Amino acid sequence: MTRNPNKKPNPEIHIFHNGEVAEFDYFGDFAKFLSDNDARVIVRNYHKRTKGKAPWQLIDEAVRQRISKKDGDQVWCVFDIDDYLKDAREKFENGLKKAKQHGIKLAWSNQCFELWLMLHFNQVSTSVSRQDYEKKLQNLFKEIDVDYHKNSLQLFHKLLPLQPKAMQRAEKIFQKDQPQENPSTSLFLLIEELNNFLNQ
């Protein structure tokens, strides 16, 4: 088949994570879901060189990759706030500025990615520790007959029917450019961006 030289290439979404497993698997499954549904987008998931990095180091790595933003391509950094903001505020804030300068979009969760998972079941309006998220999620997943643990596979597919509610709840507690607010997450902005390609 002859390739049409005038056909616009599919945009690419480059996602950098600093989490150990859960985020990488979640967005890997999301990418496959988009591909299976003929979405006109390519999702590239980066994890090997960035897991365990502080948010500003994650942003540095994304900048180092020198990814072009042509043809609608985007670069996102997905990270937990944890204690980074409290323990290294200057480095954290400088990282946010650097991301803005280089057109890198941020999908953060305060305190952690588990907040996003929790929002599929309930609204969260008070601060919750990482340990408490684990306990609460185990009980909530039992309600949908899923044995949850931190590195559970296929979380994306298991939670997909509940995603619209999670989006609404995340937006309700989100404050732009205020990652210090706990609980809060901008992760829904990346989810929204990816979902937009399903409707094109």
For each of these PLM feature ranges, what is it?
Residues 19-23, 51-59, 182-186:
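Phosphate/oxyanion-binding active-site loops and adjacent basic polyanion-contact surfaces
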Residues 2-14, 24, 28-47, 63-200:
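C-terminal accessory helical subdomains adjacent to catalytic cores in phosphodiester-
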